[in-house]
């Protein structure tokens, strides 16, 4: 999977720009606040129909403009395809091969990306919400079924929370509706939990040898998915598992009514990274946390290739120069001649010479690409 061209109109600080992309490495160089990260963000947004930097799409529209447009031509093993995203202050429109997609779940997955930025250390040391979002963003790109199940779960969760709040303040007294919601909730909570569990096991299998290689076998990395729905046997059949989830929800019905909020489900789950058996969030050094984050990102690249048959595009936002020689070497061995990569940096100093030899350089200044 490659991005051949990227066209922006009224996106962030870009009025109009076209990027003819190198099939291997694209290095965007410039001072801070010139628009390098905005270019990377536009690729991410084109892939996932949302930015990783803001939840407000209006911020993506250039100052004093009415719309923003991102268009990219992709090449796959079997041909090319344009993707388009049109953003206004009223909403957004996405197209695949010039055909408008009525649902984002039909759109996401045509362009797969892996982003590695300084804030990705928060995957290890940040809040559970950050780790859940990481799982959903990566898993959502490779499984349309998961995206749909997650959307259904979130819809039912919102309904359940609204009803619990009404029970808490006395606007409702009948719990029959809650029982109906719990039945639907249990079904989709289980689907989301099981798919996440499977995804983390696959990711761990790929991340372990990468982490061992970076640390010269001094460290062992393990991943543990930590569900709030503690089930006795995940290998049981679907109906038995749903009954177990329902039993747990019923046992805690009074607590949820008193709190006015749903206390169990995938929206409360977490992911633990362990280095040599110790929690990296609590006990890991910054170097160990950085190595863990890099191992996970490189494992994502391989997993996406396994699942969809195409390597994703790698976006490196101001992190390459921060990686030491060992980490850069492992990054290079993963991406070389396989993964199209976009890199932002203020200086090419410290970047591996082999990466530079297979790269195209773009100088970015005040929202323009200098020739």
From Swiss-Prot:
Q: Which GO terms describe its molecular function?
A: ATP binding; single-stranded DNA binding
Alphabetized PROSITE patterns for the sequence = RECF_1, RECF_2
What Gene3D superfamilies does the entry give?
P-loop containing nucleotide triphosphate hydrolases, RecF/RecN/SMC, N-terminal domain
Which GO cellular component does the record give, naming just one?
A: cytoplasm
Coiled-coil stretches, from where to where?
none
- Tell me any Pfam family this protein matches: SMC_N
The residues that the entry says bind ATP are: 30-37
Principal localisation: cytoplasm
One Gene Ontology term of the biological-process aspect is: DNA replication
Keyword field: ATP-binding, Cytoplasm, DNA damage, DNA repair, DNA replication, DNA-binding, Nucleotide-binding, SOS response
Q: Where in the cell is it found?
A: Cytoplasm
Protein function: The RecF protein is involved in DNA metabolism; it is required for DNA replication and normal SOS inducibility. RecF binds preferentially to single-stranded, linear DNA. It also seems to bind ATP.
NCBIfam families the UniProt entry points to:
recf
**Similarity annotation:** Belongs to the RecF family.
- Report the protein name in the record: DNA replication and repair protein RecF
What is the species listed in this Swiss-Prot or TrEMBL entry? Staphylococcus epidermidis (strain ATCC 35984 / DSM 28319 / BCRC 17069 / CCUG 31568 / BM 3577 / RP62A)
Q: Which gene encodes it?
A: recF
């Amino acid at each position: 999977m490659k991005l051949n061209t990227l066209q922006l109109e009224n996106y962030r600080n870009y009025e109009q720009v076209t990027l003819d992309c190198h099939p291997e490495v694209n290095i965007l160089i410039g001072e801070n606040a010139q628009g390098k990260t905005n270019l990377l963000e536009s690729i991410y947004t084109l892939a996932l129909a949302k930015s990783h930097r803001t939840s407000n799409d209006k911020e993506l529209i250039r100052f004093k403009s009415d719309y923003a447009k991102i268009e990219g031509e992709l090449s796959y093993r079997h041909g090319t395809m344009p993707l388009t995203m049109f953003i206004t202050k009223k909403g957004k429109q996405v197209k695949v091969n010039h055909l408008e997609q009525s649902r984002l779940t039909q759109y996401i997955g045509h362009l797969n990306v892996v982003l590695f930025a300084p804030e990705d250390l928060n995957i290890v040391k940040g809040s559970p919400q950050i780790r859940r979002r990481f799982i959903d963003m990566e898993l959502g790109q490779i499984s349309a079924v998961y995206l749909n199940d997650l959307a259904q779960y979130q819809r039912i969760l919102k309904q359940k929370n609204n009803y619990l709040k009404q029970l808490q303040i006395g606007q409702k007294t009948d719990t029959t509706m809650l029982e109906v919601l719990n039945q639907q909730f249990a079904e989709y909570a289980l689907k989301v939990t099981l798919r996440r569990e499977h995804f983390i096991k696959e990711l761990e299998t790929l991340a372990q040898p990468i982490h061992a290689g970076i640390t010269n076998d001094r460290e062992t990395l393990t991943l543990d998915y930590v569900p709030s729905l503690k089930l006795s046997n995940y290998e049981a059949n679907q109906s038995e598992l749903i009954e177990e989830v329902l039993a747990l929800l019923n046992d805690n019905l009074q607590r949820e009514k008193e709190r006015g909020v749903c206390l169990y489900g995938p929206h409360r789950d977490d992911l633990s990274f362990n280095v040599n058996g110790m929690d990296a969030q609590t006990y890991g050094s910054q170097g160990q946390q950085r190595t863990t984050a890099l191992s996970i990102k490189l494992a994502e690249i391989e997993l996406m290739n396994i699942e969809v048959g195409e390597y994703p595009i790698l976006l490196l936002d101001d992190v390459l120069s921060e990686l030491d020689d060992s980490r850069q070497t492992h990054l290079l061995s993963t991406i070389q001649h396989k993964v199209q990569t976009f890199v932002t940096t203020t200086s090419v100093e410290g970047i591996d010479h082999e990466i530079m030899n297979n790269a195209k350089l773009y100088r970015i200044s005040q929202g323009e690409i200098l020739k």
